[in-house]
Amino acid sequence: MKILIIHNKYQSNNIGGEDVVYKNELNALCEKLGSENVFCYEVSNDNINKFKLLFEIWFSKKHYKVICKIIKENDIDIVHVHNFFPLLTPAVFKAAKDSKSKVVHTLHNYRLWCISGILYRDGFGICEICAQKKFSLSGIVNKCYRKSLLQSFVAQLAFCFYKLTGAFNNIDYFFVLTNFQKNKVKSLGMDEGKIILKPNSLQMSFNMRIQKHNYAYVGRLEESKGILNLLEIWDKFDEKYILTIVGGGDIEAELRRKYKKPNIIFKGKCSREETMAIVSHSKYLLQPSLWYETFGLTIIEAMSAGVPVIGYDIGTRGDFIKDGVNGFLSGPDELKSVIEKSFDYIDYDSLSKAAKESAKQYKNEYVIEKQIEIYKNILENKI
């Protein structure tokens, strides 16, 4: 069995969870199947030429030809695509289909239904206005793609074109990451027979015996991630509640100016190693995201280090956080009281141990074995 993994990487100054998952998955597959059986093709948004992209975003002939060539020369059985937008385009799906390979696409976001990819709009909240339409002006008017009217227009037009031309019909199966996401994409009209639940995996090597203290937030600094709500709450706490914030974003400078308190520590963007050092030394990870999310990589990373997680009971959070077992779930108006309850929680050690145990099911070796089994079943038409 030979596999081709394809990914359109984000800009190097804005590496997202998708990039981390892609690299981790690629390495794990190479280790399990041998590098002679696993191939990769990647491009980066660092190399975007905006003028050329206006003409190539509809269907990239260049990438179509390259993918066809790779498949033919290496007898590829399965093509697994992570992100395809905006450089690769759905041309990669057609190339794989025309070359008689099976095609799998991991849904790391909701961009097939929403150009922002997150089904959330700043100042509005959870938003599915565009999800049931082939073309919607809402995403354009509200500048939902990169907060740009022009880029939102092009993105909306592109996905309308993809749908009208049946570009996604070339995908045999879609990998979803949680039960919540599976039910959500079904509700948005996806054929249940094409959906396969396959979570992300994680390389775990943390020592939970580290002395833990404080709270940590890891993520982009933007409204949809809940950082504004979190800081409004923290502003009311006394100084014994210490919050370390890892991440950057357009509103970072504004937040630093507004919240100059000794118990609110902005670290900015950190390397993966620095981030995990901060998380593993924290008593709790806070996950206050206001949108559904598709997975919870930071949640699993924290739990693998024995760090319980506190998050809103929205979207995928319930797939990972069991209230009072390995962390706490909060309603929209209860986060402050939940954090206060967590501070001197009498049974913290049990939370920590349960968090560590919860993360084990996402170990690389378990998930990759399952993934390989899924690949085999797809090739043998057993799904």
Feature map (PLM): residue ranges:
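Donor nucleotide-sugar binding/catalytic pocket of nucleotide-sugar-dependent glycosyltransferases
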Residues: 132-206, 267
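Conserved donor-binding/catalytic core segment of Leloir-type glycosyltransferases
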Residues: 175, 200-202, 207-225, 231-235
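Nucleotide-activated donor-binding/catalytic signature segment of Leloir-type glycosyltransferases, i.e.
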Residues: 254-273
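Short alpha-helical donor nucleotide-sugar binding micro-motif in glycosyltransferases
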Residues: 269-270, 278-282
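Short alpha-helical segment that forms part of, or immediately flanks, the ligand-binding pocket
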Residues: 276, 299-304, 318-319
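Acidic donor-binding loop of glycosyltransferase active sites
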Residues: 280-294, 307
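Conserved acidic donor-binding segment of nucleotide-sugar-dependent glycosyltransferases
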Residues: 323-333, 341-346
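A short, well-ordered alpha-helix in the C-terminal region of glycosyltransferases
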Residues: 347-362, 370-373
